[in-house]
Curated annotation (Swiss-Prot):
One of its GO terms (cellular component) is cytoplasm. The keyword Cytoplasm applies. The lineage of its organism: Eukaryota, Viridiplantae, Streptophyta, Embryophyta, Tracheophyta. InterPro entries: A-crystallin/Hsp20_dom (IPR002068), HSP20-like_chaperone (IPR008978), Small_HSP (IPR031107). Belongs to the small heat shock protein (HSP20) family. Its main location: cytoplasm. This is 17.6 kDa class I heat shock protein 3.
């Protein structure tokens, strides 16, 4: 993640992408000592930054987020400040029994938030979201491009 602040007021994962506005995580990629890896209550940064693909088609902007193990009730899709698409949610820790002995904790838990500045051609009032098999799909239709009106002129003579 970039340590360079965005000119748009947030932090970006890619300094060349003005639309990516991820929440800054100073511990992203930080390796924990092996002794801490067995602590079941520890939040893991891998889920904090859920992976999202953003594809633009002629008709829409399509976002796909991998959110394995989450139900749609645990995920929020919101538009704030008129053009910021925010995807957020939380995965809870698994219940721990007193007699349980954890050998390895690799599945992540905790909160995540991803934010994207949508371009001016996005139709905010027509955004649709669906979730299937742990993949969130958000479709943001685009305003159709105005094609220049061409008027044919008769040539006399």
């Amino acid at each position: 993640m970039s340590l360079i602040p965005s000119i748009f007021g947030g932090r970006r994962t890619n300094v060349f992408d003005p639309f990516s506005l991820d929440v800054f995580d100073p511990f992203e990629g930080f390796l924990t000592p092996s002794g801490l890896a067995n602590a079941p209550a520890m939040d893991v940064a891998a889920f904090t930054n859920a992976k999202v693909d953003w594809r633009e088609t002629p008709e829409a902007h399509v976002f796909k987020a991998d959110l394995p193990g989450l139900r749609k009730e645990e995920v929020k899709v919101e538009v704030e400040d008129g053009n910021i698409l925010q995807i957020s949610g939380e995965r809870s820790n698994e219940n721990e029994e007193k007699n349980d002995k954890w050998h390895r904790v690799e599945r992540s838990s905790g909160k995540f938030t991803r934010r994207f500045r949508l371009p001016e051609n996005a139709k905010m009032e027509e955004i649709k979201a669906s979730m299937e098999n742990g993949v969130l799909s958000v479709t943001v239709p685009k305003v159709p491009e105005k094609k220049p009106e061409v008027k044919s002129i008769d040539i006399s003579g």
